[in-house]
Amino acid sequence: MAPTNAGDPGRLPATSTEGHLMAVPQNPPPGGCGQRIALVNGSFEAPVVTDFEIRPDASHNDPRAVPGWRTTASDGQIELWRTGFLNVPSDDGRQFAELNANMVSTLYQDLPTTPGTKLYWKLSHRGRLGSDTMALQIGPPNAPVEQARMTDGNTAWGHYTGEYVVPPGQTITRFAFKSISAAGGNPAVGNFLDGIIFGTAPCVVLTKTAIPEGEVEVGDVITYRVNAKNEGGAPADNLLLTDDIPAGTSYVPGSLRVIDGPNSGGKSDAADDDQAYFDAETGRVVFHLGDGATAQQGGRLASTTDAPGGTTVEFRVRVERAGAGREIENQAGATYDNTLGSTPDHLTSTSNATATPVKRVVELTVVKAADRTKAAVGEAVTYHVAVTNDGPNDATGVTVFDQLPEGLTFLSATSTAGGYDPATGLWDVGAMDVGTTHTLTLLAKVTQPGSLTNAATATANETDGPVTDEVVVCARPAAPCPPHGGGCGCGGGCGGC
């Protein structure tokens, strides 16, 4: 399965009206890019040299050898230059090669190929002392065919691109540069080469993981990581990765990071100041990835031939109450370009979908009672509050709000867990295991007559709303007592609510 043409850059899988991700198959899946054909060390970045050095080609069993490249020169040597040596800048990376090392020769790589495969090539060429000429040859190793001839002066790099379809029966293809002529006539001088690409189209594979892997609770943080690997042969240009914040969660500010690959490190949430940002309006994180990526556009992701690990990004979300009892689903997408053809080809990739189950909301019950339903001003009333965690999960952050109404004065409080603050009316219970009950006893004095309603409201981090129970005490005025005792208010009371 190959990457698809981009219709809507940055577009992700659709979301249903219930907020669930309508996941689509991962495209392409790992190993789904077909045969990868790519040069090794196309920009001559290895081995690292200081100014210039002549090193053995890849046919030598020598740690100093140049990876990937071979030469027809009888001495088997390849010349590498560091950018800026003799005031000659590289065109790609920090190093480049000189085709004429100690003699006129051909530089090449032989690659396994499948007949019918479309390959793309790109190169940079420059003269050393003046105008130098070389030929690009592609074909079977015993008889490569000249595809193009390039002549460039020594003041700027020339850039060339093209396409090649592997003919029937050709299972090994040679990609070669043959020195034709060089200014000055010295066989050891001429024809600089850099930024060479030859291979299949880019093919970015996105692999997504969610940490932790198992069930989470409301309030937990999920870390999403997305790895992007270019399993094609050519580089993926203008790489843009996007990921919608899933329903039932909220983005954790400041959590954008490039874990590994180009431009690794933490990124700000704001747009236009580094290679990533969080778009609060659309609820989406955006990463510009690859070498040369900026705040405005994506960069270049090399083939896994040169960048085996690709690049990995990370961001975090917090599970909200709306996510309780459901699966938090997430899927990332990417857009990128194949810029090696006659016209740029816009491609898309989709990651695998992750699904993180969230525990259901905790059910609390609260019961409020009083030791009497009628009392006189000046008498004490004892209130009892019981809160129970009915499950199905443990509860955290359990609190009960029980503010004494006007007409009652707080005397004392005792509880089996946490403490009660009479100033705020808050009983901080804390964590409760499934099936646990905690109680609070409040002693209050009646200070004025009337119907005194006292309510207790319980909540927890995992509940979907508060639960309340209340009790009403009928407070009557305190009647004066006759001089010798007895009578209304002294032995049985009279009047009432």
Regions found by a protein language model. Name each.
Residues 60-63, 69-71, 78, 97, ...:
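Generic hydrophobic, helix-prone segments enriched in Leu/Val/Ile
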Residues 2-3, 10-36, 199-497:
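Exported/extracytosolic protein signature
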Residues 96-98, 107-111, 147-152, 161-164, ...:
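Beta-strand-rich interaction surfaces with strong enrichment in secreted/lumenal proteins
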